[in-house]
Swiss-Prot record:
Keywords: Oxidoreductase, PQQ biosynthesis. NCBIfam families: PQQ_syn_pqqC. InterPro entries: Haem_Oase-like_multi-hlx, PqqC, PqqC-like, Thiaminase-2/PQQC. It catalyses: 6-(2-amino-2-carboxyethyl)-7,8-dioxo-1,2,3,4,7,8-hexahydroquinoline-2,4-dicarboxylate + 3 O2 = pyrroloquinoline quinone + 2 H2O2 + 2 H2O + H(+). GO terms for molecular function: pyrroloquinoline-quinone synthase activity. This is Pyrroloquinoline-quinone synthase. It comes from Klebsiella pneumoniae. It is an enzyme of class 1 (oxidoreductase). Its EC number is 1.3.3.11. One of its GO terms (biological process) is pyrroloquinoline quinone biosynthetic process. The gene is pqqC.
Amino acid sequence: MLITDTLSPQAFEEALRAKGAFYHIHHPYHIAMHNGDATRKQIQGWVANRFYYQTTIPLKDAAIMANCPDAQTRRKWVQRILDHDGSHGEDGGIEAWLRLGEAVGLSRDDLLSERHVLPGVRFAVDAYLNFARRACWQEAACSSLTELFAPQIHQSRLDSWPQHYPWIKEEGYFYFRSRLSQANRDVEHGLALAKAYCDSAEKQNRMLEILQFKLDILWSMLDAMTMAYALQRPPYHTVTDKAAWHTTRLV
């Protein structure tokens, strides 16, 4: 979709929401998890790899704040960091994800060590962080608008996983429940920023491209997991059965 005449704020929001057709809820890996067709290893692999994304989110949000000169925006945006890191003695989303890891049979060290993070996942997530560091703060902030589609994916896990995977402990689902309300709040703020900033056809086209970039990141993460856990073709599988890839955060 190429915008030639500046869309109204409502029409621009509709164009952003239409990108939901490419959200990773439609990826075969996620469909398999939703339908109960994923193996224990595939669930564990997803949880371990997605943790790298979760721990990068506060770094991304801090980069946005560092580039943002507007105090009012920073005061609102900082809540996203607190949601993940925790505040006032309360645990945040990262701790909740560690509990999800334990609920699916992984140790905290399995996640914190990052030894299970596939190179393709790491590259995709690092690209997102580097974009947030280098882009203008408005564009970086609006790259988070995949949150438009997040409540649906969190609810789908709450609806289907307990039924299909009774071996997952109940306490593991807290993260998904907490994000239902948090994501809706974040969407409201993000949409307001996008509609205020994108006041020309050029900016609207670029923002749609940025949103597609973020969708590409989420989809590529699942492509990497598909190769490793569904097709049994992890990196270097033709030369070794060991995990030979790098396991440290280099950027």
